[in-house]
Regions:
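A short SAM/SAH-binding and catalytic strip from SAM-dependent methyltransferases
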Residues: 12-24
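Short acidic donor-binding/metal-coordinating loop in glycosyltransferase active sites
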Residues: 1, 19, 33
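S-adenosyl-L-methionine-dependent methyltransferase catalytic module, highlighting the catalytic core
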Residues: 24-38, 42-126
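Short, well-ordered turn and helix-capping elements at secondary-structure junctions
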Residues: 1-2, 107
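A short acidic, Gly/Pro-enriched loop at the edge of an enzyme's catalytic core
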Residues: 2-14
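Conserved short-loop catalytic and cofactor-binding motifs
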Residues: 2, 17, 75-78
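Activation segment
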Residues: 5-8, 23-27
Length: 127
């Protein structure tokens, strides 16, 4: 999240899989990623469909259930402190420097967040 020690246009590809939703200073990370990515480079991102019906249900029957059983604590405070950036916020920040080349939805290949768990994107720098 701080300035990276790489020169401008250094990387052919940057990969951020289940990372961007956790970063407290998302705008700086996105800006730095755009600075160090080569002009024809690829920024590959995967984010959870946080808040969607499918994601919420999947969490209830998996991570939340396991967390509550193991720690005997409420799960909401934990996940809210971990997933601080929602998909709309991430899309907004990405759109300042990148354009979406391709978008993938998982597990249902329909362009709707409510029925999916994750969104994958191939992005390129705006020209």
């Amino acid at each position: 999240e701080k300035g990276l020690s790489f020169k401008d246009n250094f990387f052919d590809r940057i990969i951020a899989i289940h990372v961007l939703e956790h970063l407290p200073n998302l705008p700086v990370t996105i800006k730095e990623s755009s600075r160090v990515l080569k002009e024809n480079g690829l920024f590959q991102v995967v984010i959870p469909c946080e808040g969607s019906l499918a994601y919420s249900f999947a969490r209830k029957i998996s991570a939340e259930r396991i967390f509550k059983k193991k720690y005997k604590m409420d799960y909401d405070w934990f996940i809210k402190s971990e997933h601080i950036n929602k998909p709309d916020e991430i899309f907004e920040e990405l759109s300042k420097f990148f354009k979406i080349k391709k978008k993938y939805y998982f597990p249902i290949p329909l362009p709707f967040e409510f029925c999916n768990l994750c969104i994958g994107m191939n992005l390129e720098l705006k020209t």
